[in-house]
């Protein structure tokens, strides 16, 4: 038997969990931390920031694997022949023989349990007035992530509900959930709630646009298997305008936030504008 090196195992782990995409869930957390740091570092719990980051990371990896599992079960991945394109969705780890279907489900379940453990640990040092809200947000986010592809709800096939759930999870739920978890005080009644609620809009829409772009190369295969996301519902031509509309809202809200919150936000505004315009030109 040929021994497998640690580096090969690590690459395999990165592939089957789609770990590089976890930046979509970690960057909003760091954005919240940066916001509070610019005000006063003592306003947040560093311990909870670390626990929250780990919990969200494992929850995201678990969701990725559950999505691959259910996409394979319902035949979505088997019907997609464009998976070597850079922006095609899914890891294709099962199709490529990197992991079996039962093992995918087992690891996804294990990662979920680890995420729940970190989430529970966070509650022990969360401000009393924020605990209930953190629990509700966490449960909601986990359910939306799981039922994104899981039957019987399968949000991804509900003509736009999948994209709405992605916006909700990676925008308001993640930004506000992190804030409630790490803020040393009653966050809902604080002066920071509206600021971060506003910031959650471009963050959520940015992730939604990334998802939208991934749906374009999967269009034909997803349509055949009943995965009726926005691109499958409205077609490639019309979906371009959905992407453009989201980009305009992202740019406007980010620009407004930069003018009233912190001028440093002009940097991501410029990045979003330049990169978003590049993609817009490509799809049009």
Predicted feature residues:
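Topogenic membrane-insertion module of multi-pass membrane proteins
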Residues: 1-51, 55, 59, 63, ...
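Membrane-embedded alpha-helical segments that form the functional core of polytopic membrane enzymes
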Residues: 29-30, 42-72, 133-146, 191-213
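Helix-coil boundary and interhelical linker segments in multi-pass alpha-helical membrane proteins
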Residues: 33-54, 117-135, 174-201, 253-265
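Acidic (Asp/Glu-rich) catalytic motifs at the cytosolic membrane interface
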Residues: 58-84, 208-231
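Multi-pass membrane catalytic core of lipid/isoprenoid biosynthesis enzymes
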Residues: 81-125, 228-261
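Intramembrane alpha-helical segments
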Residues: 90-186
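Functional transmembrane core segments of multi-pass inner-membrane proteins
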Residues: 164-219, 237
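Extended hydrophobic alpha-helices typical of membrane-associated regions
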Residues: 259-284
